[in-house]
Amino acid sequence: MDDASTLIDVKEYPDTEVQKNRVLTLEEWREKWVDGKIGFHQEQGHQLLKKHLDTFLKGKNVLRVFFPLCGKAVEMKWFADRGHCVVGVEISELGIREFFTEQNLSYSEEPIMEIPGAKVFKSSSGNISLYCCNLFDLPRVNIGKFDRIWDRGALVAVNPGDRKCYTDIMLSLTRKGFRYLLAVLSYDPTKHPGPPFYVPDAEIKNLFGSTCNIHCLEKVDVFEERHKSWGIDYIVEKLYLLTEK
């Protein structure tokens, strides 16, 4: 694993067992949207993505970009406006509808025949498709392969016991020459149960190391006042670029 030089010294906690059995249900995630408990949403977009956008896109046009657990991420509109094709998956129908409404985008919806009760929402422009379903049901649908994956708030939200299955699905969606941008969080997992969950370097290497080159682009202190209620006194975001070995 190749680490970028940084002034931030991040303590790694080898004992991550404290969170390994933590489980949030799909209904609990839906309730967070209904109750407006979406502190993870960034109205101005993700600053590290903006900073490293050229590294991520590498000058390519008309890419297929996948957003796992997309919520109403404003970056989906950014990529679509640049001519890329965006596909996302999100369990909250409310989150998806809010995305289209807040971005002033007209859209259509239709059932996903392979997944009972699921729907796909498509922008009228045709270059944004958001699947409202359980991410782990997604392999039942042929959504194609992707040139880029922007994983922010996804791996850190997946129940720790599901990470291997999640990673297998993500990698199954990649095209040759893919670039996968991954944002994770470091904090003391003995003080906060998650989500977002603590994902150490060793876990990333374990999940992606056999198939991907792993490069840490940046580490940033993202501690805010709201984090005090979590019982922690620091939180660091790490941005990784994963590429094909």
Curated annotation (Swiss-Prot):
Keywords: Acetylation, Cytoplasm, Methyltransferase, S-adenosyl-L-methionine, Transferase. GO terms for biological process: methylation; xenobiotic metabolic process. S-adenosyl-L-methionine binds at residues 29-40, 69, 90, 152. It holds the Pfam family TPMT. GO terms for molecular function: S-adenosyl-L-methionine binding; thiopurine S-methyltransferase activity. It is found in: Cytoplasm. Its EC number is 2.1.1.67. Substrate binds at F40. SUPFAM superfamilies: S-adenosyl-L-methionine-dependent methyltransferases. GO terms for cellular component: cytoplasm. It catalyses: S-adenosyl-L-methionine + a thiopurine = S-adenosyl-L-homocysteine + a thiopurine S-methylether. Coiled coil: none annotated. Monomer. Belongs to the class I-like SAM-binding methyltransferase superfamily. TPMT family. This is Thiopurine S-methyltransferase. It comes from Panthera leo (Lion). The lineage of its organism: Eukaryota, Metazoa, Chordata, Craniata, Vertebrata. The gene is TPMT.
